[in-house]
């Protein structure tokens, strides 16, 4: 039986009449990369704040590393690391001083050896005494992750860690996240609104929308729920469209035809039905997490984000926190 590191039970967070997190439940297995995927404003950051004891829940409960987030907050904090969406380093200090400040804030004693090992592992040793204000974005992210690992946590929470990064730096960070899992044996709880990121990194994903968990499973399991395999054909002018009468044509645009099929094996049925002499190309389109979200919510993540009035939402949150 899998050991559970994060156990969430009917957790809710309400600001006035607005439910930022609405009765969510899930469990994170020890040693996995668990992704909370959803658009901006879906409740991802609020969930992390609840699990890291930065904000109390309105109702429900959870345990992290075996400790109750309400009754055992100090124990929870001692056993977690946290990487925020924004880099939070002191630019006036060097890398070593930032690590020392982190140790002081967390009450970590005898931290120097672990800090040296982390700097070596993340290839930052030669920059140990360099002012971090002169670090590249990638180096700054590396240092922030090293700081999150300084207390040897059981779980590291990463809230939108690659937002705003260029493609190269984002890929570098993906490699670091996999390293954390494989080399440091740390459970990773990751929030993101990037479909590709969740697909590439996560062992399992919970999709959150409007504060509710609407799906949970591995990337493969979620994509299987969406179905939606398709075949894209590019044909010559003499192509006989009637040869596809037994298939559901999703779209026809000049010499390009998109056909829905129930499984990738049905691609052979399409090939058997048509005159191959009039076929220029054929491609199988597999389900994606984008199609999963679209099927579950009726909109894409981008469309969901655009529908949220953030100024109204944050104004309401501030009023209810006063």
Annotated model-derived regions:
Residues 140, 240, 285, 307-316:
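Short, basic, helix/turn surface patches
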Residues 1-12, 299-322:
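ABC-family P-loop ATPase nucleotide-binding domain
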Residues 79, 101, 114, 225, ...:
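Generic alpha-helical secondary-structure signal
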Residues 72, 148, 225, 292, ...:
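Residues that scaffold the ATP/ADP-binding catalytic core of kinase and kinase-like folds
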Residues 175-262:
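ABC transporter nucleotide-binding domain
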Residues 3-6, 13-209, 215:
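ABC transporter nucleotide-binding domains
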């Amino acid at each position: 039986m899998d050991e559970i590191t994060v156990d969430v039970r009917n957790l809710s967070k309400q600001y006035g009449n607005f439910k930022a997190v609405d009765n969510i439940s899930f469990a994170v297995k020890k040693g996995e990369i668990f992704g909370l995927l959803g658009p901006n404003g879906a409740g991802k950051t609020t969930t992390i704040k609840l699990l890291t004891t930065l904000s109390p829940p309105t109702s429900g409960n959870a345990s992290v590393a075996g400790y109750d987030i309400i009754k055992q907050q100090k124990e929870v904090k001692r056993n977690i690391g946290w990487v925020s969406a924004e880099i939070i380093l002191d630019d006036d200090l060097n890398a070593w001083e930032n690590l020392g400040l982190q140790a002081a804030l967390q009450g970590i004693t005898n931290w120097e050896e672990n800090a040296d090992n982390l700097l070596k592992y993340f290839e930052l040793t030669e920059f140990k005494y360099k002012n971090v204000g002169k670090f590249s974005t990638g180096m700054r992210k590396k240092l922030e992750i090293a700081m999150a690992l300084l207390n040897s946590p059981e779980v590291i929470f990463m809230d939108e860690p690659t937002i705003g990064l260029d493609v190269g730096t984002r890929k570098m960070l993906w490699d670091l996240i996999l390293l954390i899992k494989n080399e440091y044996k740390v459970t990773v709880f990751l929030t993101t609104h990037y479909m590709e990121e969740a697909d590439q990194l996560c062992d399992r994903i919970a999709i959150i929308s409007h504060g509710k968990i609407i799906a949970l499973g591995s990337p493969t399991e979620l994509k299987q729920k969406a179905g939606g395999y398709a075949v894209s054909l590019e044909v010559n002018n003499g192509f006989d469209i009637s040869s596809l009468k037994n298939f559901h044509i999703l779209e026809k645009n000049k010499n390009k035809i998109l056909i829905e099929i129930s499984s990738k094996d049905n691609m052979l049925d399409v090939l058997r039905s048509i005159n191959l002499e009039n076929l220029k190309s054929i491609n199988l389109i597999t389900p994606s997490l984008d199609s999963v979200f679209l099927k579950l919510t009726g909109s894409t993540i981008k469309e969901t984000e655009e529908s949220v009035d953030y100024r109204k939402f944050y104004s309401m949150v501030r009023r209810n926190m006063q």
